[in-house]
């Protein structure tokens, strides 16, 4: 098991900040509103606006994210991604976005994250691997 039930609940109920990097190491961070865990090892993101992050993920399919209230929920998640522009995951994010906010633009892709590591960002424990 990688993520606990608490971690999954926090992800589903929060905005996240996703960090990516180019193959040359140039970083990019963006807020993500549509993010939810599918199980204790995978998280799904709806890509409606990503430009630089998407290009980074296509060239370097790794990312890290924290939830908006990292002081209260001090976890950093790291993983590998797959990008889907059609199929089951894409259909799932299109329906999810439509149900949640009918005025939101249709997602361009679904980004499936396989969580590989979880770290603490809590004062005193920052950088400690949790899972």
Language model features: what each stretch is:
Residues 1-131:
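Binding-site signature for planar aromatic cofactors or substrates
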């Amino acid at each position: 098991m990688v993520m606990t039930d608490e971690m999954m609940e926090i992800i589903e109920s929060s905005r996240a900040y996703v960090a990516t990097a180019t193959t040359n190491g140039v970083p990019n961070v963006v807020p993500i509103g549509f993010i939810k865990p599918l199980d204790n090892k995978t998280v799904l993101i709806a890509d409606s606006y990503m430009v630089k992050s998407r290009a980074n993920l296509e060239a370097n399919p790794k990312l890290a994210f924290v939830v908006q209230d990292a002081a209260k929920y001090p976890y950093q998640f790291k993983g590998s991604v797959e990008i889907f522009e059609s199929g089951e995951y894409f259909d799932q994010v299109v329906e999810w976005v439509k149900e949640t906010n009918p005025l939101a633009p249709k997602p361009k892709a679904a980004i499936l994250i396989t969580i590989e590591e979880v770290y603490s960002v809590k004062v005193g424990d920052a950088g400690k691997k949790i899972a």
